[in-house]
Amino acid sequence: MHLMCTGLRNEKLINDRKILYGECNLNIKSDSFIILLFKEIMNPFFIFQIFAMIVWSLDNYIEYTISILFITSISIILELKNTIKNQKKIKNMLNYTCPINVYRYNTSYIISSSELVPGDIYEIKNNMTIPCDTIILSGSVTMSEHMLTGESVPIHKERLPFEGNAIINKNNKYDSNDEKDDYLRIYNNHASINMIKRNHLIEETLGKKDREYKSNTHDLCSMNKLCYINNTYDDVHMKNNKMDYNNNNNNKKKKKINNLNFVKGTYINSNDLLYDDKIGVNIFEDDVNNMKHKFNQRNINYYNKDTNNLEYNNKHRYIYDCLLKKVEAISQKNKIIYSNEDINKYMLYGGTYVLSLYNINKIKYNNKEENRILGLVIKTGFITTKGKIVNNILYHKKKELNLINDSYKFLIILIIYALFSVFILLYITLSNNEYTNHIIIKCLDIITDAIPPALPTTLTVGISIAISRLKKKFSISCLCPHKINIAGQINTMVFDKTGTLTENNLQFIGIITQNKKNKNMLSDFIHIKEMNTESYIHSKDDNMIHNKNSIISEYYIKDNMKNLHTSSKKKSITKERSNFLVQTIKSCLLKDHYIKEKKKEYYTNNTYCNDLHINDSTCSSYLLNSETKDAYCEYYNIDHLCDINKKNMDINSKNELMGKYSKNELMGKTIKNELMGKYSKNELMGKYSKNELMGKYSKNELMGKYSKNELMGKYSKNELMGKTIKNQVGVDTNIYHMNCDNDYNYDYPCDYNCNNCNDTYHRLEYHNINKDNSFNIPPEKNKSYNNISEHIKINYPLLFEALACCHTLSKVNNKIMGDVLEILMFNFTNCDMLINNNSFIIKEKKKNCSYDFQKIDGDKNIGANDERCHLNNNLVSYNILKRFEFQSRLQRMSVIVKSTYGNNNDDNNDDDNNNDDDNNDDNNNDDNNNDDNNDDNNNNNYYYNIFCKGSPEKIKELCLKSKIPNNYDEILNKYTKQGMRILSISYKRVKSKNINLLNVKRSFVESNLHFLGFLIFTNNMKKNAPDIIHNLQTSGCQCIMSTGDNVLTSIHVAKKCGIINSNVESIIIGDVIPVVGKNNKQKKKLVWYNHKNDTYLKGHDKTCIDNEFTSIQSQMNSDNICGDNICGDNIYGDNICGDNIYGDNINGDNINGDNIYGDNINGDNINGDNINTYDNIYGDNYNLDYCPTEYHKCTYNNSILYRNNFLYKKENKKDKNYKNISTLYEHRTNDIQFDKLCDILINKDPRNVNIVLTGKAFIFLKKKFYSFHLPYYEECKNIVHYIMKKKHKKIKNIINNHNSNLYYHYNIIDTFVKRMNKEYMCFNKLLYKIQQKLLYNLIHNLYKKKKYMNNYYDIDEVHLIGNNNNNNNKNNSKEKKLPLKNKMKHIRKNESNDNITFNTYTSNNIHLSKYKYVHHKNYYYPDSCTNLRKKKNSLFYNLKKYIYYEKKKYLQHCLLKHDNYKKVELPRIKDINYSYQMESIKTRNFIHSLSEQFAFSNLILSFYIIKNDDNNVYNKNYIYNKNYIYNKNSICNKNYICNKNYIYNKNNIYNKNNIYNKKNILTHAKSVLLSGSSKKFLKFFSNIIRRHKLKEKKNKKNIKRYKMNHVNNTSKGHIILNMCTHGFKKDYSSLKNKYRIVNNKRYMLKNDNVYDRHMYNLTDMYRGTQYGCSKKKNKNIYMNNNNNILKNKINRFLEHLLVDKCKRNICHKYTDIKNIKLSIYEYILRTCTVYARMKPKDKSDLILSLKKLPNNSYVGMCGDGANDCLALSCADIGISLCNNNESSICSSFTSNKLCLHSIVHILIEGRASLVNSFQLFKFISLYSIMQCSQVLILYSISNKLTDNQYIFIDIVTILPLSIFMCWTSASEKLSKNIPIGKLFSFPILISIYGQIIIQLFFVMISLVVLMNLSFYKYDKNKVMKEKSDDTYLYKAQKYTLIYSLLFSKFVYVYIFKYKE
């Protein structure tokens, strides 16, 4: 493509392409008047109207026919006029031609743009409109594409890169010598000596001067010239290839050289262009003629593919033989396939406007070089992008509205009605024996009366009126008129955030950079207004004193002072002036050019060293193509200035220097003879002993590296920091001018390296010195900068460079154009753009009194310490070499900037370190760099700065992990939650040798970056946004936000504008994170985070909640966690960070009175793992930077909770990477697993919870859960029926065969079927409960967990593993062999507070209190519902159902008989809180609700089976194990077991009194919590058991038996419902304790439906357990004594006791919508209100998904018309808020006013148009039906209406009513009721048919009344005789006139008023 710069040459080819593609113009032929008239007449409705007029004329209705014809003709003429006018307007708008300079036939000439064909090369000029789709071959341009895309921001286009040239000169230098030398190098450098003669022939060939055809992009861009050959020439083949070059015989067989590796940069020319429109690939033919631009083109012909031969002269035979195969191979490599997104960078679309030209290259044509930019034509005419858009607009598929289709159907109904009337008329006439020809005309007349031809057009009248009203009143244009009716049915509105809900104008308010002291942390927010000089001065002074590599180099001053030519008399400086000396030197380093010019004479009079002959040259460096200016290094007579200073300083500054410091102080902080300005006489750093420094150095040594009396290792004994000589200074009393030139050589070194130049561009700003050398220091100068950017440029130079360069702005007509955000960022830097032909330079604007320090390239051979910075008055400038444009898909952009700083100034000085070892390393690196750069000049030794700007999430992925600050996510969350818009900037530095700018890939540029800082912008909300959102919501329209911004920023804006209600309790955020699975394959995992709403919490709790991401646990109880004060005293208080950090105790005291687990927490070991450092909390190095997402950051508090996590330790030993560590954080309680999402929703009002999704989560949900549906109500009943009657396997097959997409949890459906039939069932609650169970199953099947996670919760065996701190390694090795077993749980009671804590060796740490509970989960499924979900036939399932039945039966029927409590209704809880204060409870209702909740919910209670023997007595003594280990400090209370070490239990319990019974067994291997005396329970329940046994004996033969046996054959046992007594009030606890023991071990169960439902045939999957069931035999359930039933203590019990908060009059009943089938994806789609980080394609997918919802929702999209084009086109209506009318191409409506009121106006007018259309339709249809019935009645009495009557009815009455009905103004507010959108709907049909019946009823009544009147006489014979008389009709008028005028007009007006 690049090689087509010579243009087309074949005239035949040009003509063929003109015929094939047509002319390059969108020329539309307009139709003539006759054709348009014919189209109007051929309309079927107009034909029907002409037919009706013919019928009326035959029926003698001449006047009426003429009037209708006149009205119709006027309407047709007006329509034709508008059509012709629109056609001319469109033609003039699309027809565009301009003169074009095209290159054809080896010359350039001007032609019309309409004559261009694909393959032409033409010149692109400034301010021109591109006539066709063009590829840029050279240079770059800035385009305005607002016409096509709606993008108002200018777009920068670059030339198409040539991928074939992969090699460039490493020095980026390209010689401009003869082309002959370039081509000679190709062969001579790598060819053998034998080829010299042959190369001589090539030299002769290339020596010709006809080189004008060689011009191409390869020659245009100086960087693209041919380079060396990679591989050597094969001499063997050359020797074997014996060719006679003097032979003229062309038919001689030629040998081919196969191993000739020619240069990769070979270019291929082609003239034949083919464009494949399907894949967008540019394919060229005749690529074999690739070398014709290198040789004599006159002697080269085209390659003939048919014969595979080339016609060439004998002279070139050798060359073409050598290159034939290589050219073909290279041509295939150079065919690059570009995607649509990639080709957009290089393509200029037809119809776009050229704003400016850049990088114009020199092109040689006709021996003349001209600066031009060339483009290649690839598409013309209607094939172009603009042509396709025009095609779609002009010839689009007319989408017929449903209303139009419904009107046609309704016309069929009217035709049927007319035919029915015709049959009636025929029957009447035939019955009267009237056989005349007039009957046919009467029948046709009735048909014309019944069928109004204008009925379909009435539906479009309201549309046209609404569009005209929107255009005139509100400046809203409409592209698709039919969308106005759809706008009236919108019930969902999607908003973009930026530019739509918020203002377009952003404010740049500050930056956040890395902390200079600690690079791993970000500093606080630096507001722009807070950047004052005061803080700058302190940091500057500290750097000058403490930093030996400071820019204001003391060595530089000292060396210059030594080299001054001073006088023989040297005045000494006393000690009193020694400190003042340093201050004065600093103050005298002025850069005020104004002072220098104004006081030139005074300075010259006091100047020495005249014989040095120093010229007024510059002391500057050439920085990034910046111009050089003069700067002086001025030195003053110190003593003279001191004396003058004492005399002339005013009172306020007499004893102060710089406004703050005393006379003899150095830097305002030192005493008279102090060193370093801050410390006492012999102390340094103020913290160490008298003569010691940092506690590391000897007595008289400083910094450990210098001699005894030396300071900083480089100064003499009496020198101070290289600036002062303590006793003497060799200067005289006058000012010395020191002019430094780079080219001037002095005795001292003049070039030094500046290691810290990146950190600070120090600019000493000082005020004028008067002629008397007095200082004038205004105090306001120290308060603020003249320009705020000075602070950033001085202290953050890299950030300043990024702000100035990292953008896509352009300059057009001296005006900066581009994105608003980038304009703000660029204007802050006070820079300007200088755009030349081949450069894009950013240069700082000139300032009057401000000069910069700039760095120069020093002598590399000098060490880093011998550095030097020159004072220069040049302004900073940067050269942008390459830009990668911003892409919404990538969410970033990047630039490559050329800099002239030394290579040793790698910003990795920011790495830190002032250590000498690091400096030595830098010096070594510099030396290595010098070796590499020996061939280069110092002035050309550049490096490239790469800056990347984008979203914080993307930049974090691209940066090196070591360069990301630790508090990156914390700072990001902090400011995004405040609604700030944040951009991240990163950089990396690349040497010029290591990068090829022409072929560098974006992936290389945007990788391994270093984080630089955050840019903070504010985006204010539009003032009317909350009102508009509220108005839409109250009108029944759901509002959704879809934005590409950060999640927290989107939530903040959504709260502020009202999309998220302020009363919402919590916001649940869904996101997708990468998870490493098996074989180290990354998978995506959906996670949920809980984000609490601050406004709700503040309003209800009246407390200030920190707006951070909080977990469900939020904060631990500040008083007690484990019964003692772990958090009550200070965890981070006195003793952790105080004295005893690693001491004996955390809080200075023992927790629980003794050491936890017998050892110190921070002592030797905790569970065998060392936690002496923060990184070793988990036993291995753990870095918080490796958290998978920003929400996974964990605080130290949370990490402490998991230090005993056995699972984590085992996992962490496998892999220490963050990939496995992430599993720890995935189970944090703020990380809500997907299966737990509905656990939150099920207990809350759905209106109080909002869901927020990211773009990744949205796509994930769509792919994974789109096909899973909830069952219908009737399907639930059928499945329950199958479950009760059939077996499990059959049911599973039936369900799978029934519908594979339906997923049922058959175990729970029966419970829900019961609840569905309740009278006041809340649909929302039911939906969440069903959803909860379905999500459990789906997640389990989609994500297969690891075996150890599943086995942990399975009821398998009990292995009580102890932990001995002395044998940790042995225990760990044993644990690896064994599966995860159930551990002994310790229960410890806190008597001071009613709390109970379960400290398990594994994962469960539960904290229960009166008001809340905290459950820390470390696994996916911590509760026992996992068993219910995984194994339906498990023991736990059967046991739970058994207990459910037993508890319900016996507690209700037996226990209540002994209850004396009064029956009181359960009170409602006023507020959903965790305080459960209950009054007296109705026991029956309480137990019933408890048992009912237990049947279906996630509730898990503790069940223990204990012995039922008289010998079983639980004493208040201690309980020990058979094999036990206890600590000396172990404490055991009377009602519980408490041991600091773990207990080994072998299923045997011993009493302290050695009372042992083999039958006594505790099946659950945990302690039992009993309150009160157990004897009372046994006596109380003994009577119940006796009664029950009597009943069993009676019914023993006819009942099924339920048997529960243990492995040890214990005969008796009880099930105790163990509920915590400390979680309730006293009355509740006492009530519960009375009914502890529920039932005996063995019972006979009745054969009832409840039992049949739950106890059916099952097969156990567990080892050692079996299930069996049959009708004859008893059902036996064998319980293994090792089964662990309990995992969670009172998990959801309290929540399920709450009364539903939903008001029954608000929530929907399930019976109203019971047949809705809802998928999981649709369920979340309905409840989600905010979508963040959405890409443009994601937005369109969201809108399409919302449109597919089953309730026929209509979705609207509102955007700014730039990034939302795809979403706007996919929506039912698209509303673009843009200033440009042309952007309406991608949206249905365009508002010129950037105001959200346009949305309300469009919806109002849409609803008004819909209502008006329906009203007019009903009015016209009823009018025609009534008129038909009226005429039929008159015909039955042999009468009819006259002409005047028809004219009066149709024209005078009906026509004005229909016109004024449509012009009725719309309402000013949106109503709550959305109008009906279908004609065939029940209300409209009832209205029409009801009116027909009513009018017929009144007509019949009126006729009966008329016939019964006395004056009415009807003689049939007389009428028949008078028919022939003309006076017949007039005689009948006195009857018909009354009827027609009074009755019919009354009916018409009545209908109109009724409809109004």
Swiss-Prot record:
It is found in: Membrane. Keywords: ATP-binding, Magnesium, Membrane, Metal-binding, Nucleotide-binding, Phosphoprotein, Translocase, Transmembrane, Transmembrane helix. InterPro entries: ATPase_P-typ_cyto_dom_N, ATPase_P-typ_P_site, ATPase_P-typ_TM_dom_sf, ATPase_P-typ_transduc_dom_A_sf, HAD-like_sf, HAD_sf, P-type_TPase_V, P_typ_ATPase. The active site is at D496. Gene3D superfamilies: Calcium-transporting ATPase, cytoplasmic domain N, Calcium-transporting ATPase, cytoplasmic transduction domain A, Calcium-transporting ATPase, transmembrane domain, HAD superfamily/HAD-like. It is an enzyme of class 7 (translocase). GO terms for cellular component: membrane. Residues 901-938 are annotated as: Disordered. Residues 1-35, 81-407, 463-1818, 1864-1881, 1953-1956 are cytoplasmic. Mg(2+) binds at D1760, D1764. This is Probable cation-transporting ATPase 1. It comes from Plasmodium falciparum.
